[in-house]
Amino acid sequence: MIRGLLRGIKRFWSRLVLTRCRPSCHRERGGFMGRTGVDLFIEDGAYTTLSSAVVILVVLALLFSSTAAIWSMSRAGDTQVAADSGALAGANVVSSYHTAATVVDASILSLGLAGFATIGTGLVAILIPGAEPVAGNMVDTGIEIIKTRNKFAKSASEGLQKIETALPYLVAARATQAVSAQDTDSVTYTGTALAVPRTSESDFAALKGSEISTDAIKDTSDDLEYAAEELRKASEETAKAKERAWLADCGGSDESAIGRYSCMWERARSLAKLSDIENPHYASSVTWEPQVALDRAKTYYRQRLANEEPQGSSAKMEAESVARKTFYTYAIKELDQSFIKDDGEKISFKIPFLPRTPGEVKGTQLYTDAMWPTSTNDGGETYQLHYGTGCPGYKNGSPGGLASVVDYDGRELCKKCEFDVVTLGRALMPPSFIENGFEYHFDEFKDALEDYVECRNKEFELMRQTEDEADRASNAFDQAIKALSGERPRIAPPGRNGVVAFAVSSEVTTPDELNSSFNTAVELGSRGAISAAVLAPDNATAQNNVLSRFFSTLEERSGGVAGVLDGVMDVWGRLLVGYGDIQGSADELMGEMINGLGGGGGALGSIASWLGDTVSSSVAALGLEPCDLRLRKPVLTDTANVIKSPGSDIAGLSKTQDKLRSIPLGVTDPKALCEALEYQVERTISGTVFTLAEIPLPGGGSIPLTVDVATLVGALGGGS
């Protein structure tokens, strides 16, 4: 560098001196003027002492002046850094509030859904056998959750509005702190930030006016519980009657436990030799139906008719065999006309009356139908009734027409066959009164069937009543839960467009270390800078980060009330951390909770299945949109983007230099600084910690949600 400098000096003096001297006087080289020019610095190709000294002086002058210039520019940059810090700090307050408001909204909605999920599961549990002891408690717990949600929503609405009122001040205060934090021993920085716009357009009416009434749910659930209990009792009676009918038909699979001659199935197998296909067995009354017994009886009597033979060769034995065949034929005819119809709304039946005694025969067609041959004996003076034309008495007499038993009741009997109403009544009298007879168990089946039909029809009536109560309960549930599908709160706080920060610094003089004989001290006057920041979504954050941390804090805070919340916190927590896709989370949870109850059979089971589908449909019909849970982080931007943004109330801000000069140095009161910028703010929140809302706990106590006003960092706290 020195070599180049000397060469430049040499060229300068050479041109200056030689150009002036040579044309006028043509002096010889080495004259006085030549020596006092270039030769003072260069002689015989070498540098002189004078030239070296000049170079050193020039270099030192340049060095110290450059250092002073660099120091001056750095001080100007420091002011911009202070303004940037204020802008980012102010925007961070808005970001923290936005996060807090989102968490509150998520908490209220998810808490409401948790309550309805518990209520809906409880309503279904009322109808599930085995789950009814806890069903009432589940409904009551769900109602308490809804009441908790109502109180939480009201307090949160008031808290959020109060914070928004103070938000411009909080933005200014945080920015003032950030700017002042740049102070050094020699420089003081003063500044603040303005929230743009200053006014709020948030709408919390959806929270404030969203109290959900659960009175109808409570009333209908009580009615449903009573109807379900009555239906449960009726179903038990129906099941008992059905089991008695089943025992009479085919409950004799265990002879050692029930008896040797235990049921129709066993008697049909022993007496009629029916195959397993013709004579099916059912091990349980659950899978058995009464129609099985009717079909078994039809098959049995057809086979007995086909197998019937006289037990001896006498006319009396023949008469008894004919009487049995007549009874079998009559039974088949009657059974063909019998039925049991259960259409799911009413059960009706027709079961034949099979006579067991002579007296009962007189009430049937066996007594009145003219189907028995007659004859006259003793010259036509004696009329007798016979079992058939094969009777010796009939053959020995004169054949007559057919007659009924009633026509000859009380007359003289045929001495050969002695056929009369007693013969018919006696045909099955013993089997009907002792357990080794098929008819004995058939009569047991008929008695049980009559009880079963009566119980079943009563069950149908109670089932309709329970269905009506379930419908009322589902309607009450549907109407109540619709409150959650209303418009969500609109979060549009002051500063939603961004913040504009102003910063000024005090006068400063270069430090002594930079002052010397080669330069004069530099005095910098007051400097100012302006900056702006906006909020940008952070795609790198997981959607449930904030809510997961928030709920973890709540769980820690609720640890002292273990046993009060039971599974409520689990249900709420799952919905809360799934708030990003709240509808999907609610649908999935509702399905799992109802399916977790297990299925139920019978009348209650079908109603429970219907109610479960209806409740799940009500939840699905909410149609809740997915939520954007990305964190908002402050980023610097051009001040014009904020000042001239739509809705800006500082769009008329002009003469920025004048505004900067109006900031009083050393002032740390955010309100005073804002007033200097013609921007009005009010400190509406006092103290260092502000309670945003309180979550009441079932059974007493609450969890406060607080805002740390002192630091304004991570605005939401779980009671800490």
Q: For each of these PLM feature ranges, what is it?
A:
Residues Y408-V422:
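Repeat-associated, polar segments at repeat-unit boundaries in modular proteins
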